[in-house]
């Protein structure tokens, strides 16, 4: 059995959703061959996917242009999306030719709009898995009759079934939807790299877009905290504050593996990080993303369901993190109970491929 999988290259959250489902499918049916259509770094993909796969790495969507991890560029996003949809028919034709050679039984997508017209053309099921889609995102920015909106609506309307985990946006363009439990990356047991440090510990995470700018040396004022920070391209001539420790992630040490060893995760709100905090029961200090249409829905979860506290982008940039960190660490709200949505999703997908 062959399955083609389209994964958005907008950050790591779409891969974080799809990977547990694909791993589950491989465990149930090790005979499945996967073709992944995804432009994310191969190292990141192989750190999350525990099986061999074919890959074609050209982009499968535009997503949203980020000025940095917590600030979106609406004008640049619309300009890029407008150019992309003008070539969409030609791109669909290329995808059809590619997949005819692969001969898939079905297509999965999170949440490239190319996948569903291709599935229809090949006469096979097209299944979506997502907590957001680009039609819903751009509908906040553009009129309903804009060519971007109508083109995306036409593509997504060809989806046979959309699977939606918790924390999903309202996505009315998909006619048939089914809710599933939480999809998450399971933490591996790793040695605690900061076990002997008695300070409170914060893991600073901003996903695939890297760290947004902030006043690094202001962190030394929070002397009771140790900050674990990845993606630090530090000038060797510049001294780091004594309470900042760089972290290098690899296949044997992922962000979720460190979460059980810290007191708080400081992050932008996004599905991947929030689901990992949920399952490791790690409190969340979050930075606002007011320009991104998904943010209000995620904020409802942060305000009402999680031990979490937010801060403005200005406070983050100036290094004024203390209030949010301390409030999140002692927040009385427990994380909700959860079930493994990858099991449910895999069973549904296999029922379409049989």
Set out the residue ranges of the language-model regions.
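Conserved nucleotide-sugar phosphate-binding/catalytic loop shared by glycosyltransferases and other
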Residues: 9, 32-86
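Short amphipathic alpha-helix
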Residues: 15-26
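Donor-nucleotide binding loops and adjacent catalytic segments primarily
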Residues: 22, 185-264
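Conserved nucleotide-sugar donor-interacting segment of glycosyltransferase catalytic cores
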Residues: 94-153
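A donor-sugar binding/catalytic signature common to diverse glycosyltransferases
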Residues: 106-110, 254-297
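A nucleotide-sugar donor-handling region in carbohydrate enzymes
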Residues: 138-211, 231-233, 253
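Nucleotide-sugar donor-binding patch of glycosyltransferase catalytic domains
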Residues: 248-249, 283-327
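C-terminal amphipathic helix plus adjacent low-complexity
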Residues: 322-354
